A protein has these predicted regions:
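N-terminal secretory signal peptides and thylakoid transit peptides that target proteins
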Residues: 1-17
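A short helix-breaking turn/cap at a secondary-structure junction
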Residues: 27-31, 221-317, 362, 495, ...
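Gly/Ser-rich catalytic/binding loops embedded in alpha/beta enzyme cores
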Residues: 29-205, 318, 323, 405, ...
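Glycine-rich, small-residue loops and helix-cap segments
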Residues: 48, 102, 142, 146, ...
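Acyltransferase
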Residues: 54-57, 86-89, 307-332, 356-368, ...
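Residue-level signal for inorganic ion chemistry
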Residues: 59, 81, 258, 294, ...
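Short helix-loop capping/hinge segments that flank enzyme active sites or metal/cofactor-binding pockets
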Residues: 95, 100-120, 286-298, 328, ...
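Short glycine/serine-rich loop segments
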Residues: 132-265, 459-480
Length: 512
């Protein structure tokens, strides 16, 4: 779509939006460019219908008007963004056409942007300013993206909420009393609020998928090691730490934009595997929705899932079935979900041990001694993971390899698995100590950390998982679906999401 004169007039006047307003009138959002896709904006930039500086100024005006309420963009580099936009406009005028040239974006605070602070919400790191970019940020900049700033996260990126002592609390644009999710919560909130069209997040326990589900946007948890994890955090490693669970992934408001950003980010690190390997991802398995073989999972043996979430999932599966998709609700090759969850939880907890205070480890060791061997609860798996020996870690890793083989075997018969991203919709802010929190899931009191059960499937075995919005709860809160595919078949899950989006719709703006 072209940017007509009235649209240009809006952008020119964007700075006049009342910063002091609690929330601008809905009409302002509807009349703005803020909810266009990255693809549309890039076409407008390439054709000369809009300048990068105009897009940057419009985004800054919207952030300044709304973010005192939402608190998503907690590190700002507006002067740097304006300078980068001017440089991008000069390049566009010369005919340069990098894939993201002139597009304003934000990135999660944990990713290093040279000269900007990276604390991960930890007060002792609040003044730390890395001098080099995270490799993923370097790739975004090389593609021409203009970085406006960085978005909020929980302390250490270890929560399904986004608050910390350094930057405060990020609110969900759909309901300010609720969390946008975590750990990429500021990223999802920035997208939902219309600040930017692309974001960069990461995931080890649902950190891309939870916020996308809670805020009604799109995210893609990539296949393990698809995007190198080098240069992140206040104490970055000099070469990439080979992935065990955590991944980097794109976030957007459309499936096509996920594919666009992934094309920029994916590929081996030139310092390590890139010396000898190039990435060639397979194309999507199918071009038509009705050709996909779909397995739907709406129940987990270790944790309930809210009826509103399963209802939206089953509503989607019924629509797909009516279209002619081959829908299954069970499969003889489906790996044991309980074993998958317990193995994941132990390895996830083990990944945190090196960064825990010694007193916490001592408490966990004391608690582990009280566990019965028969206690196979999810909470017990956490304690065992936090006190795991190296020998037991190897045993759990062997179990993971066996589960990975079974999941990959399943994808010989199935193209995608659909399941909830999380057991609930966005919940009210809860800043009490994390290990004492609980969730109310349709009247059932559930330990807070159990909510990672659905997210853990794809993380444990390194599979791609795309999350997209598919409906609303009775309270009007977004509900998403998680689309899991075979290893390195990232294009298939994104393509399936794009087909669903085309057929049934996708992102809708919150009532700001």
């Amino acid at each position: 779509m072209s940017l007509d004169p009235s649209r240009r007039a809006f952008m020119a006047a964007a700075g006049a939006v009342a910063v002091g307003a609690v929330i601008p009138a809905r009409a302002a959002a509807d009349n703005a460019i803020d909810y266009r896709t990255a693809g549309d904006l890039l076409k407008a930039l390439a054709s000369g219908r809009v300048a990068s500086r105009e897009l940057v100024d419009s985004a800054i005006a919207r952030i300044e008007a709304l973010d005192s309420i939402i608190n998503a963009v907690v590190v700002r580099d507006f002067d740097g963004a304006r300078a980068a936009a001017a440089a991008a406009d000069a390049m566009l005028a010369r005919g340069d056409r990098q894939s993201l040239l002139g597009l304003p974006i934000t990135v999660k605070e944990s990713f290093n942007v040279a000269g900007l602070p990276t604390s991960m919400g930890e007060p002792k790191f609040k003044d730390r300013r890395p001098t080099a970019d995270t490799l993923a940020v370097e790739r975004l900049k090389a593609a021409g993206a203009v970085i406006l700033g960085k978005t909020n996260l929980p302390l250490g990126a270890r929560d399904w909420q986004s608050f910390n002592e350094v930057y405060g609390t990020t609110n969900n644009p759909w309901d300010l009393a609720r969390t946008p999710g975590g750990s990429s919560g500021g990223s999802a909130a920035a997208l939902a609020a219309g600040y930017v069209s692309l974001e960069l997040g990461a995931d080890i326990g649902g950190s891309l998928r939870c916020p996308a589900h809670f805020c009604g946007v799109f995210s893609h948890k990539t296949s393990l090691d698809l995007i190198p994890y080098r240069g992140s955090g206040p104490l970055p490693m000099p070469i990439p730490l080979r992935g065990d669970l955590a991944v980097i992934g794109p976030m957007a408001r459309s499936a096509a934009d996920l594919a666009l950003e992934l094309s920029v980010l994916a590929g081996p690190d030139p310092l390590t595997e890139g010396v000898g390997y190039k990435l060639v991802l397979p194309p999507p398995r199918h071009a038509r929705l009705t050709d996909f073989r779909v397995l739907v999972l709406d129940k987990h043996p270790l944790c309930p899932t809210a009826a509103s979430v399963t209802g939206a999932l089953n509503g989607l599966s019924e629509k797909l079935e009516k279209l002619g998709c081959r829908i299954s609700r069970d499969h003889p090759k489906l790996p044991d979900l309980a074993q998958t969850a317990r193995t994941y939880r132990q390895l996830l907890a083990a990944s945190y041990v090196a960064d825990l205070p010694s007193e916490t480890i001592e408490q966990m060791n004391a608690r582990a001694k009280t566990l019965s061997p028969d206690d196979q609860s999810y909470s017990a798996a956490v304690v065992r993971g936090l006190t795991i020996s190296h020998a037991d870690w190897i045993r759990q890793s062997r179990a993971r390899v066996g589960l990975r083989a079974r999941w990959l075997d399943l994808f010989h018969d199935i193209d995608v698995v659909l399941c909830p991203p999380m057991p609930t919709v966005a919940f009210p802010h809860d800043h009490s100590p994390q290990f004492g929190r609980h969730l109310d899931i349709d009247g059932v009191n559930v330990p807070y950390n159990d909510q990672s059960i659905w997210a853990g499937i794809a993380i444990l075995v390194g599979l791609p998982a795309t999350t997209m919005p598919i409906g609303k709860s009775p309270e009007g809160l977004p509900i998403g679906v998680q689309i899991i595919g075979g290893y390195l078949e990232d294009r298939s899950t994104i393509a399936f999401a794009e087909l669903i989006e085309s057929e049934f719709g996708g992102f809708t703006p919150p009532p700001l």
